[in-house]
Amino acid sequence: MDLVGVSSPEPGPAAAWGPSKCPWATPQNTVSCSLTEVMSEELAKELQLEEEAAAFPEVVVAEGPFISGENIDTSSDLMLAQMLQMEFDREYDAQLRREEKKFNGDSKVSISFENYRKVHPFEDSDSSEDEVDWQDTRDDPYRPAKPIPTPKKGFIGKGKDITTKHDEVVCGRKNTARMENFAPGFQVGDGIGMDLKLSNHVFNALKQHAYSEERRSARLHEKKEHSTAEKAVDPKTRLLMYKMVNSGMLETITGCISTGKESVVFHAYGGSLEDEKEDGKAIPTECAIKVFKTTLNEFKNRDKYIKDDFRFKDRFSKLNPRKIIRMWAEKEMHNLTRMQKAGIPCPTVVLLKKHILVMSFIGHDQVPAPKLKEVKLSNEEMKDAYYQTLHLMQQLYNECTLVHADLSEYNMLWHAGKVWLIDVSQSVEPTHPHGLEFLFRDCRNVSQFFQKGGVTEALNERELFNAVSGLNISADNEADFLAEIEALEKMNEDHIQKNGRKAASFLKDDGSPPVLSAD
């Protein structure tokens, strides 16, 4: 069989000088393909397949139930993915904590990145050593439900069902919820399970009461810390006493030995001072520390003893009440110093530090000397004590130019067979507007005590007043006697304002009303 090729007629060559033909109208030439070439390509393809089959034999895979679509289980994969995600979240949270710690540093104001955490507090069980049960408080029955907030437009609803922000029920529930903002110590009651509604009037009254109670508690707390109480001292006073012991002036403070309306007295053992040799003053072996109370409860009604005293009159109006108490301690120091120079038995002043006065201790081995009210004396000792008291009153009036103003059996001690005078912080000079009245009151207290004690020689208050002051006031009854005393005080006060004299000795040589001496 002859192989016959199939071919298309070829066009002849075109003349160069002939007219040009359009390329779109020119048919494409068909490439002829012989039968021999086709047979050779199929043979080559078969040979290639045989070689591939020989080189790569076919692997037969047996069919099993594990590849069926009905039994596919991916729960373990989901759990692994969740565990991996949780680990990634914890690493992210740890990185946030490091960044937060680095960002805050040692600053007192810190910024928290807790809102950017990925792990929930309930799931983050490894973040704390102690296992704490986390409880979602969103549905806590013990937490009152928050009122529905009012939108910006100011009302809710439409038509007849409009509810404004001024609605009585809405305002009542809001006021009930606002009670949680009161101070922790303010009792607001338990309203669980009750739909409480407080009116604006009641809520405003409660709010004002809560604020006033908070301010009052703060004042009481401050007053307790900054004021002395009975048998106790405030921190500032305690610090002053500690400095006295630390400096070596006092060896030790044993405890409280007496309490009064204005002061508390402590016992202490004396030490030594660095400038003790220079001053020539030795600290007693036993000392009494008189701490004036800073509560101001008793001093408010006792300012008349100091504001009219010319020694402190100019300073009294310029001081606040707390500094006035320090002036009381200073006044007692000056009075004791004046009495000590006159030889009157009284405590010796060692040191004055603000409102703390250190004096010599009248007693022995931490046992204070008894008061005349407490001691039991025989008739001879009581008589001796009376004449000693009379002499001390005359000596205090004439030599010290002072009136005790609170002399009684409670402010006189019996020690070593002598009468000792104490508590002279309120003592004034006779030129005081009420000095003679204070002297008459002292005479009454002394006369009544010794008359009750069995001293028949004791003078009455009018006779004792004339004996001490040297004035010859003759009056049959107490009312007339007091009237003459007030008249004398008025004359003396007018004389002081007219002449400007500050001397305190009365002229007693003539019978005229007492005036101030020129010297």
Swiss-Prot record:
<keyword id="KW-0597">Phosphoprotein</keyword>
<feature type="modified residue" description="Phosphoserine">
    <location>
        <position position="112"/>
    </location>
</feature>
<feature type="active site" description="Proton acceptor">
    <location>
        <position position="406"/>
    </location>
</feature>
<keyword id="KW-0067">ATP-binding</keyword>
<dbReference type="GO" id="GO:0005737">
    <property type="term" value="C:cytoplasm"/>
</dbReference>
<dbReference type="InterPro" id="IPR011009">
    <property type="entry name" value="Kinase-like_dom_sf"/>
</dbReference>
<dbReference type="GO" id="GO:0045087">
    <property type="term" value="P:innate immune response"/>
</dbReference>
<keyword id="KW-0690">Ribosome biogenesis</keyword>
<keyword id="KW-0808">Transferase</keyword>
<feature type="modified residue" description="Phosphoserine">
    <location>
        <position position="125"/>
    </location>
</feature>
<dbReference type="GO" id="GO:0032728">
    <property type="term" value="P:positive regulation of interferon-beta production"/>
</dbReference>
<feature type="compositionally biased region" description="Acidic residues">
    <location>
        <begin position="124"/>
        <end position="134"/>
    </location>
</feature>
<protein>
    <recommendedName>
        <fullName>Serine/threonine-protein kinase RIO3</fullName>
        <ecNumber>2.7.11.1</ecNumber>
    </recommendedName>
</protein>
<comment type="subunit">
    <text>Interacts with CASP10. Interacts with IRF3; RIOK3 probably mediates the interaction of TBK1 with IRF3. Associated with 40S pre-ribosomal particles.</text>
</comment>
<keyword id="KW-0963">Cytoplasm</keyword>
<dbReference type="GO" id="GO:0030490">
    <property type="term" value="P:maturation of SSU-rRNA"/>
</dbReference>
<feature type="region of interest" description="Disordered">
    <location>
        <begin position="122"/>
        <end position="159"/>
    </location>
</feature>
<dbReference type="GO" id="GO:0071359">
    <property type="term" value="P:cellular response to dsRNA"/>
</dbReference>
<feature type="modified residue" description="Phosphoserine">
    <location>
        <position position="8"/>
    </location>
</feature>
<dbReference type="InterPro" id="IPR051272">
    <property type="entry name" value="RIO-type_Ser/Thr_kinase"/>
</dbReference>
<feature type="domain" description="Protein kinase">
    <location>
        <begin position="251"/>
        <end position="519"/>
    </location>
</feature>
<feature type="binding site">
    <location>
        <position position="290"/>
    </location>
    <ligand>
        <name>ATP</name>
    </ligand>
</feature>
<dbReference type="GO" id="GO:0031333">
    <property type="term" value="P:negative regulation of protein-containing complex assembly"/>
</dbReference>
<dbReference type="InterPro" id="IPR018934">
    <property type="entry name" value="RIO_dom"/>
</dbReference>
<feature type="modified residue" description="Phosphoserine">
    <location>
        <position position="128"/>
    </location>
</feature>
<dbReference type="GO" id="GO:0004674">
    <property type="term" value="F:protein serine/threonine kinase activity"/>
</dbReference>
<comment type="similarity">
    <text>Belongs to the protein kinase superfamily. RIO-type Ser/Thr kinase family.</text>
</comment>
<keyword id="KW-0399">Innate immunity</keyword>
<keyword id="KW-0460">Magnesium</keyword>
<dbReference type="GO" id="GO:0046872">
    <property type="term" value="F:metal ion binding"/>
</dbReference>
<keyword id="KW-0723">Serine/threonine-protein kinase</keyword>
<dbReference type="InterPro" id="IPR000687">
    <property type="entry name" value="RIO_kinase"/>
</dbReference>
<dbReference type="GO" id="GO:0051607">
    <property type="term" value="P:defense response to virus"/>
</dbReference>
<comment type="function">
    <text>Involved in regulation of type I interferon (IFN)-dependent immune response which plays a critical role in the innate immune response against DNA and RNA viruses. May act as an adapter protein essential for the recruitment of TBK1 to IRF3. Phosphorylates IFIH1 on 'Ser-828' interfering with IFIH1 filament assembly on long dsRNA and resulting in attenuated IFIH1-signaling. Can inhibit CASP10 isoform 7-mediated activation of the NF-kappaB signaling pathway. May play a role in the biogenesis of the 40S ribosomal subunit. Involved in the processing of 21S pre-rRNA to the mature 18S rRNA.</text>
</comment>
<dbReference type="GO" id="GO:0098586">
    <property type="term" value="P:cellular response to virus"/>
</dbReference>
<dbReference type="GO" id="GO:0089720">
    <property type="term" value="F:caspase binding"/>
</dbReference>
<dbReference type="GO" id="GO:0043124">
    <property type="term" value="P:negative regulation of canonical NF-kappaB signal transduction"/>
</dbReference>
<keyword id="KW-0547">Nucleotide-binding</keyword>
<dbReference type="InterPro" id="IPR018935">
    <property type="entry name" value="RIO_kinase_CS"/>
</dbReference>
<dbReference type="InterPro" id="IPR017406">
    <property type="entry name" value="Ser/Thr_kinase_Rio3"/>
</dbReference>
<dbReference type="GO" id="GO:0039534">
    <property type="term" value="P:negative regulation of MDA-5 signaling pathway"/>
</dbReference>
<feature type="modified residue" description="Phosphoserine">
    <location>
        <position position="512"/>
    </location>
</feature>
